[in-house]
């Protein structure tokens, strides 16, 4: 009952010509979403014995149900989950914007020759937190409260330059393309957790006030930066729309590869 997902999206584009030789445009896709209650699982309810009695003699709900000397589980009902809405919760916010821009110009002095640049700018951010109050979802009433907070961010840019020559001479058609592109991606992630939060209204917003252990696990912190660079050339000749010859060469370099072995060429 306390789980929900909300998403807002915005998309727009335009393609505008200026005179006979210049054209530019943009495509944008932006979204924002919120996910709540993902830490509240139903497995405990599904796994509970159908003959278990979750009620006390006076009709009130028990805190836990014990099947035998070893098996005991926290009682979960819709009412319990709703009552604990501010004491047992999680929230994840995601924002992303993806943008592609281009500009194209034709050479007025050379028929069939044009230059185009494509630019991609992307950003993605995710921020999430969870909080479980004292004794909640635990067979022990004094189990310390816990909270965690994490954040990740990804930025990416791509630039692609294309020079194209495309002409038809009678039955002969010639298409020549040269391309240079580069891109870079940066990813960061951070995470912190705490035990024994002094006040439930702190939830996961003030983990620094935790009276118990504050955990900063280095395995949950990350920074990555990578890049890719490419060159490409292609020549294609067609005769009478029946016969075609094509030659292509491409070279890529990746920062993820070892120095001295970053460039690879593909004929």
What is the predicted function of each stretch?
Residues 134-135, 263-265:
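Glycine-rich, phosphate-binding/catalytic loops in enzymes
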Residues 2, 255-260:
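Solvent-exposed loop/turn segments connecting transmembrane beta-strands
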Residues 1-4, 15-19, 109:
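Outer-membrane beta-barrel pore proteins
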Residues 9, 13-98, 114-230, 256:
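Surface-exposed loop/interface segments of Gram-negative outer-membrane beta-barrel transport/assembly proteins
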Residues 10-12, 117, 159-161, 229-235, ...:
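Extended, hydrophobic alpha-helical segments in both membrane/secreted and soluble proteins
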Residues 12, 16-17, 28, 103-107, ...:
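Residue-level signature of outer-membrane beta-barrel architecture
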Residues 20, 109-111, 170-172, 241, ...:
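Short coil turns and loop connectors of transmembrane beta-barrels in diderm outer membranes
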């Amino acid at each position: 009952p306390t789980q929900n997902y909300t998403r807002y999206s915005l998309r727009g584009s335009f393609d505008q010509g200026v005179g006979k030789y210049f054209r530019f445009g943009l495509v944008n896709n932006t979204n924002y979403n919120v996910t709540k209650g993902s830490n509240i699982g139903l497995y405990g309810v599904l796994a509970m014995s159908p003959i278990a009695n979750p009620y006390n003699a006076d009709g009130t709900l028990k805190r836990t149900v014990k099947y035998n000397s070893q098996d005991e589980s926290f009682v979960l009902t819709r009412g319990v989950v709703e009552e604990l809405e501010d004491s047992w919760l999680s929230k994840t916010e995601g924002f992303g914007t993806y943008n592609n821009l281009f500009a194209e110009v034709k050479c007025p002095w050379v028929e069939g020759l044009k230059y185009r640049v494509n630019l991609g700018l992307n950003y993605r951010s995710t921020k999430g937190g969870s909080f479980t109050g004292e004794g909640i979802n635990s067979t022990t009433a004094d189990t310390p409260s816990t909270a965690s907070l994490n954040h990740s961010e990804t930025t990416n840019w791509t630039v692609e330059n294309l020079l194209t020559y495309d002409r038809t001479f009678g039955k002969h058609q010639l298409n020549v393309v040269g391309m240079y592109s580069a891109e870079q991606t940066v990813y960061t992630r951070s995470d912190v957790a705490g035990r024994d939060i002094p006040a439930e209204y702190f939830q996961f917003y003030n983990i620094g006030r935790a009276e118990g252990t504050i955990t900063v696990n280095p395995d949950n912190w990350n920074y990555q930066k990578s890049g890719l660079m490419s060159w490409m050339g292609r020549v294609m000749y067609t005769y009478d729309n029946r016969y075609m010859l094509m030659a292509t060469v491409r070279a890529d370099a990746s920062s993820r590869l070892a120095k001295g072995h970053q460039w690879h060429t593909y004929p």
